[in-house]
Every structure is written in structure tokens, then in C-alpha cells.
Amino acid sequence: MAPAMTLSDKEFQKMRNWAIKCLRTIGVETGGSNVQFAVDPVSGRMIIIEMNPRVSRSSALASKATGFPIAKVAAKLAVGYTLDELPNDITGKTLAAYEPTIDYIVTKVPRFDFEKFPSASGHLGVQMQSVGEVMAIGRTFRESLQKAFRSLEVGVDGLEPKWAFEEDPDLIRARSFDLTSLRFATAFRLLKIREAFLSGKTIKEVFEITKIDIWFLNQIKMLSEQDYEETLYQLKSKGFSDAQIARNARTSAEKIRKTRIKENILPSYKLVDTCSAEFEAKTPYCYSTYDYENEIEPIQGKKVIILGGGPNRIGQGIELSLIHISEPTRPERSADGVVW
């Protein structure tokens, strides 16, 4: 996720300095690189676990999350430009030398395809087992986390167990939960953690067996403490879908949707502008959230909407993204705007 919510400023600055020292030691003079760290939350011991002296999937994620075109800037630096010579394409006023700042939360969740490998244990370790990932942006961590799980296309409407769809919410809360099922990391352990909180387990109990940072556990627990007195707007701002709200209200998603529209509870759109709205953005890269202020104006005239293929999976990869990128550039397209 970005920004890193559980790192102290001292740890952040230490990582920054070590990353630069790592690049200098290896001999990377220009171009894109990423350095990954592991931090012991008890002792504070920090080690470098990986360094990629190239543009990678992590670079693509960082570019999407911040709006800063890492690959493009790296290529220009490689041919002799300097950062203070390159304009920021999004603002048109600042330079690439300025570090991007963000006023939102970005969450990445990996996509696994264990169901296609019945013999696989499903336990996660030091080896990469994901076949793709999704990235979601929200004003809060809870909102972006729920949006990310919905985007995985694994049959969930947010951060809740799959079996919750057919059961009474009160029965779920009364269910006894076996904490030992959280001992090992699995593809859907976060869903089981929410199940544990719904069953009445405390943050301390879950932390003792998972060692997941208490900040994250507290965020998931707050999602599990959905109050029936909360307004529809408050629930939507926490990332709950109409279907999730409907199940707890014992009604249909369509009724919730109609009520939202009637009460004018509609998503607004915020800009990813690299500068936390300090300067006007020229490029319409935005995300939806539930807030009273819209930062963009609707496109006038004829529009074309391009639907993505979702997260990578076995049998569906990045080749579909190439088709989506190429399609709007066809000469016969006469739309005034393209919505991705």
C-alpha cells in the first residue's frame, strides 16, 4: 500500500538513504530501479531483500499509484536529460525533480489461481505464487481495501467471507471461530481475519497468532463493527458495496441503489495529480470515492468507454490490455472522449 502507514519517519528516511547507497554501490547511474526492505517490528532491524536495477512490475504499480511516469522519465534520463529539464505532464507547471505527494490511499492485492491446482497447499511463503494483482484507490485504507477485493473477481463484494452471502449476519456474529486457522498465511487470510472479528475475537487475540501490525487489524475490525445506525453515506465512504449493505439491512441491492440515487448519494471523482491538489491537473487521471466535492467535469459530446479485462489470471494475461490500449486509436473512432 502507499503511503506506508506503519513506518516511522526515521525508518522511512533510513530506507531512502540505504536505497540510494545500494544503487551507487551496484553502479546504477540512471534509469529505474526499486529496492525492497524487510523490517523487524520489534527490534527495528532492517534488511534489503531484493533490488531490481530495471523497470519492473513494482515500477508500474508505483507509477499508477503516484501518477509519476517512472519508465518515461528513466528513459529520458538515460539519454542525457536531467530531472530539472523534464516537465510534469500531469500538472504542466512542476518539474520531474519534485517528488510526488498523494492525498489518498493505494492498496494492491495479489490474485491467486489455486483453484486450478488442486494439489497446491494454498499456503504462502517466500516464493511468489500470485498470477496477477489489482490496485485500488480510496480516501481511506478501508475504502481502498474493499474496492481491491471486489476487483479481484473471486466472487466477493468486499472484505467479507464468501459464505457470508447466504447466511444471516447475526448467525455469523454468533459463530465460534478457530483462531489456529489464522496461523498460516493464505490467499484469503484477511477475509478470515474479518470473520474472526465478526465472531467476537479481539485485536490482541488475532495479533498474537498472526503478528500482523495492529494498525491493519484495527482497520479490519472497524469494518466488522458496522453500526446499523450509520448512514448510507457513511457506509459507502467505508467502501461497502450496495450488496454488502443490503445483506446487513436484509433487503436487496437494487433497493439500496434506488435509495442512494433518491438521496443523491453518488460517487464523486478525485484527481491523481502528484501534488495533493496544490496545482491544477492537466491529465484526467482520477478515482471514484464518496465525497461531496467533484474534482473533474464530465466529458461533453460522444464518448467511448473501454472496459479492462481485470486482474491477470491463467488463460488471461496482459495481451488483453494491449488490445484495450490499441482500440481507441483506430482512425474510425470519432468520439470526443475516451473513458477507461
Locate each region found by the language model.
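ATP-dependent carboxylate activation and anion-phosphoryl transfer catalytic cores
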Residues: 1-231, 236-239, 263, 267-268, ...
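Short alpha-helical "recognition helix" segments of helix-turn-helix
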Residues: 206, 245-246, 325
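C-terminal amphipathic alpha-helical interaction region
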Residues: 244-249, 253-294
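Glycine- and acidic-residue-enriched helix-capping/strand-helix junction motifs
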Residues: 314-322, 326
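Single conserved hydrophobic/aromatic residue that forms the stacking wall/gate
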Residues: 323-340
